[in-house]
């Protein structure tokens, strides 16, 4: 998970490791 891809994402990547993969679509 690269936080730099979603700088506006407020959800902790620790809790949502797949969140970026879901939002990137």
UniProtKB/Swiss-Prot annotation:
Residues 10-25 have a biased composition (Polar residues). Disulfide bonds: none annotated. Optimum temperature is 60 degrees Celsius with carboxymethyl cellulose (CmC) as substrate. The keyword Hydrolase applies. It catalyses: Endohydrolysis of (1->4)-beta-D-glucosidic linkages in cellulose, lichenin and cereal beta-D-glucans. GO terms for biological process: cellulose catabolic process. Residues 1-25 are annotated as: Disordered. Keywords: Carbohydrate metabolism, Cellulose degradation, Glycosidase, Hydrolase, Polysaccharide degradation. One of its GO terms (molecular function) is cellulase activity. It is an enzyme of class 3 (hydrolase). Its EC number is 3.2.1.4. Optimum pH is 6.8 with carboxymethyl cellulose (CmC) as substrate. This enzyme hydrolyzes cellotetraose, cellopentaose, and cellohexaose to cellobiose and cellotriose but does not hydrolyze cellobiose or cellotriose. This is Endoglucanase 1. It comes from Ruminiclostridium josui (Clostridium josui).
């Amino acid at each position: 998970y690269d936080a730099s891809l979603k700088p506006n994402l407020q959800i902790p990547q620790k809790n949502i490791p797949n969140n970026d993969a879901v939002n990137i679509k």
